[in-house]
Amino acid sequence: MTWDHVNGTSVEAACDESGSDGENLTRGNTDVFAHASVVLPMESAAGHIREIRDRIRSPAEEYKANHLLREKHRAVLEWLLSVSGPLYGQAHVHLVEKAFFLVDRTADLLLDDPGTALSLYRSRRATFSAEEWREFLTAANRLLWIRVDEAAGEPVEAFFHHIDRLRRAYSGTPAADLLERFTQGRERAHSYRAAILGGRAPLIPVLNPLPSSILRTAAHWSGGGRPVRLAHDRQNMLTPERIAWIEDTARRRGIGLTGLRLVVAGSDARVQLADFLAGIARRFASDELNGRGDPALTALLRPYTGESAVWGDEGSRARLGAVAEPDNVGTGPAGCSTEVNSAF
């Protein structure tokens, strides 16, 4: 399906993700979440999948990004992302640095000011030890995670105990001043946890990057006023209620999303291409984040990352060609999910 300026037919972008660990942002398998989308006719996408198979010559029945990431298939990978490849100008990927996403969501919950997150995140290395920072992230993850296997106040008190310890240890530093601001949100934190324990958890989990990434994807493809539909690989968290929330939020924010449907990746070649791109982008972005990026491969990815990402690390952000922005999906004081804010 393509955009028709005469009759207003929607473009349909096929989507998939890589790096999802649900709400577990500190002890999962990956440090980056990537959400990729592809706009191609089904027939063309199927032809590209066949060509990838022919170039790789692997006996595998199902191809994943890992096949393309093997060094022996580097030429195929470079072709796929190149200007002359099948995805150039027809695909997009939204990147999320999980640690920054977590700090951003914590600042939004406690302060209604996600801008504080970027300042704290960028001061971390000059202030805290690696272990202290990991402990802070773990406490924040526990605070925001929607689960009811512990008393409402326990994650709150554990988080603020850690905040107080860091403030005392680094008194007088800019980071300590930022942490002081977090203490203003204790009542909000208690309300949030009490709502979860009382069966009033937010419809959209605060720590799951998928819903906001879908909205970002829709915003990208609906730029210029064209309507867009999304065909997404099946995900357990994309219930009918959450899909309705995504569609309603998009309408209220002026994003031209006309619908979101779930498909089986194995039956949609476009989604398979999106799966390739998501896995490739996640690996390249993680490599850059951890100081082991390949400049040539990162340069090939850069045209697909667009101008925004939920990304706090300055060096890797610049190399990936993304502009750091807050995630924009928050919760109210009682843990009720709010709409995407004005950054959209």
Predicted regions and their residues:
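Phosphate-ester processing/binding pockets and catalytic centers
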Residues: M1-F344
